[in-house]
Amino acid sequence: MKRIAIRVVPAAALLALGLAWMSRRVAGQATGQPSTKNGEWPMYTADLKGSKYSPLDQINASNFSKMEVAWRFKTDNLGPRPENKLEGTPIMVKGMVYATAGTRRSVIALNPKTGELKWVYNMDEGERATRWAPRQLSGRGLSYWTDGRGDERIVYVTTGYRLVELNAKTGQPIASFGQNGIVDLKVGVVIGKDKQIDLEKGEIGLHS
């Protein structure tokens, strides 16, 4: 029962935090939002409705068999060991592809035409991420946010449960967010009677 309490209570707290954070973010996205209409894929499920649909029609049943691989990007070196599977969904915004990759869950920005690496960001969290994290590898993906006036950010969660905001153009952490671009999602999560969970070994729930 104690293990259940550790997982469920923090998950509820994180959900409330996530909804509050997202409501503020969405409120600031009234204009200039990317869309699948121009050939891009700006969100994990395409759009806020989760449609998973693109209106593009250049690829269809008649020409699908003629498609060829344009380029490949290997992620073997993005972590202490190679990753055997990739379950995340890359996004494409304003002519740039963003994805999480490798066993350290790095964030990469690629030129969609050539596959050229534009920037990469990763965090070495030690055993908190490699030994104690229940969900490792590259994860399911990341998010893009903009205020519509030039401030563009990539948002993701590390394997060690840290929420990170990066400058979408440079890959540098946003200094004004949390502590130099990072919010430790374990800090402030308690079990029992006001007992802070172990920041290294403590396990919390996290859902999109």
Task: Please give the residue ranges for each predicted region.
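Aromatic (tryptophan-biased) beta-strands that constitute blades/sheets of beta-rich domains
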Residues: 29-80, 116-131, 172-199
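Bacterial N-terminal signal peptides that target proteins for export
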Residues: 1-12
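Bacterial N-terminal signal peptides
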Residues: 10-20
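Signal peptide processing junction and immediate N-terminal pro/mature segment
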Residues: 20-30
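Repeat-blade elements of multi-bladed beta-propeller folds
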Residues: 41-45, 83-102, 106, 133-163, ...
